[in-house]
């Protein structure tokens, strides 16, 4: 799967996460902003990484701004951003979730 454009999914509202995805060249790089990064940062990054790998993306840059999202929300927002970035949103791959 190839990133064709920079894409965003999610909001900056409470209990949500905003994911911005763009083309990368050296693996999955995540820039995470979160008030709970110290406690949950590793888990948030793990969920994002696993979702991207299941979707077939290995070289991407992620800017994630977390506002207390649950894992299911993180997965859904990551998948939505990935589908927009690869321009495949008309063919949802819900098995990734």
UniProtKB/Swiss-Prot annotation:
Its main location: cytoplasm. It is found in: Cytoplasm. The keyword Cytoplasm applies. The modification O-(phosphoribosyl dephospho-coenzyme A)serine is found at residue 14. Keywords: Cytoplasm, Phosphoprotein. Coiled coil: none annotated. GO terms for cellular component: cytoplasm. InterPro entries: CitD, Mal_deCO2ase/Cit_lyase_ACP. Covalent carrier of the coenzyme of citrate lyase. Oligomer with a subunit composition of (alpha,beta,gamma)6. Belongs to the CitD family. HAMAP family: CitD. This is Citrate lyase acyl carrier protein. It comes from Lactobacillus acidophilus (strain ATCC 700396 / NCK56 / N2 / NCFM). The gene is citD.
């Amino acid at each position: 799967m190839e990133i064709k454009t920079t894409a965003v999914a999610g909001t900056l509202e409470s209990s949500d996460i905003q994911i911005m995805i763009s083309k990368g060249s050296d693996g999955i790089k995540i820039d995470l902003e979160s008030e709970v990064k110290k406690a949950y940062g590793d888990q948030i990054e793990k969920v994002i990484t696993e979702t991207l790998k299941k979707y077939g993306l290995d070289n991407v840059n992620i800017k994630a701004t977390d506002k207390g999202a649950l894992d299911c929300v993180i997965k859904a927002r990551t998948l939505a951003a990935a589908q927009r970035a690869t321009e495949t949103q008309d063919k949802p791959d819900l098995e990734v979730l």
